[in-house]
Amino acid sequence: MAITIKDIALKAGVSHMTVSRALNGSKLVTDETREKILLLAKQLKYKPNLHAKGLVLNKKFSIAVVFSTLSSKTAPSFLLSCLNGVYQSLTKDYNLVIKDLSQGLEHFNLSRADGVIFVSQQESDDEFIRFALAQCTKLVVVNRKIALPNVVSITVDEISAAEMAVNYLLQRDYRKIACINGPELIQSSIDRLAGYQSALTQANLTSAADFVQDGGFSIAGGFVAMQRLLALEDQPDAVFCANDEMAIGALKAINDAGLKVPSDIGLVGFNDSEICQYTTPSLTTIHKPIEQMAKLGGERLFQFKYEIFKQWWK
C-alpha cells in the first residue's frame, strides 16, 4: 500500500497539514520539524500524489510545449534541442505535453497545463498567442521576437548570425556565394536570407536569382537544392545553408559530383548541430543556442518580463 501524508504525520507526531506544509516548503514549519519530516518521507519511500497535490495547490504539474508544426518545416535536431532545454528547466514533478498547431485552435485546452512554452516559427503564430493570452495562460515564446504586450519572448539576432556566416566565406575569398534557405514563411528563413543578402550588399556583391534555392530545412531538400546549383551554367563557389540538415544534404551532392569542400566549393551551415562534427569534412556552422533558449524559456515561464536573449555565438 502506498505511503500517505497521514502515515508520515503519525510517525512524526504532527498533523497531516504540518507534513503537507513541510513537503511543500512552507515557511510556517520550523527547520527542525521540516528536516524530521523530510527524513521520514525518505525512509518510508513516500511518493507524492500529484493529482491530490495539484488540487490543493491549483496546479496541473504539466507544461505544454507547442510548435508551429511538427510534421514538416521543423528539423529533427531543432526539435530535440528545444525539448532537451525545456526538460532541463523543470522539476521532477512536471510532465511535458507536446503539441503543434496543425489541428487548429479548437483542439487546444490550455486549462490542462500550468503554462505554455511556444516555439514560434512564423508570423501566423500570433493567432495562437492571442488565443493563449485570452485564456490568461502563462506563456513564454521561444525562437521569435513578439511585439505583443505582456509576452515573454526569447530570441537571438539571426540576421547578424547569417551575416557572420557569409562573411566567413568572404574572408576566404569566395565571391559567388549561393544560399540554400528554408521554407519562405518561416521567420528563421526570412531572417537568415536577409542576413545573407545584407552581407553581400556590404561587400558590394550581388547574387543571381537562381543562387537562392529552397531546401525545406531537410537533408533531402538540401541535396536537391545543391544539385540545382551545381547544374547552373555559372556555378557558385560557396554556399550558405540556413540549417545544418540542408548543409549535410548539400555536402552529399557536392561529393557525388566529384567536388571537394572547401577546395572546390565552400560550405557553411547554421545551428551547430552535433552531427556536423562527424561529417567528412567536418562542417563549419554558426552556433544558435537553441537548447539554452528553451531552457531559459522554462525558467522564465512564470515571470512576465520581456527579455531578448543576448547574442551567444561560438
Regions found by a protein language model. Give the residues of each.
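Alpha-helical recognition/docking segments in bacterial nutrient-uptake
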Residues: N58, S62-N167, L230-A231
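Short acidic capping loops at alpha-helix termini that bridge into adjacent secondary structure
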Residues: K176, S207-F211, V261-G266
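N-terminal helix-turn-helix DNA-binding module of bacterial transcription factors
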Residues: M1-F61
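Hinge/beta->alpha junction and helix N-cap segments in small-molecule ligand-binding domains
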Residues: S68-S81, I98-G104, I154-M164, I180-A225, ...
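Short acidic/polar active-site loop segments enriched in Thr and Asp
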Residues: S15, F61, D114, Y174-K176, ...
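Flexible loop/turn connectors
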Residues: Q227-K314
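Short gly/ser/thr-rich secondary-structure transition/capping motifs
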Residues: Q43-N49, I98-L101, S120-Q121, L251
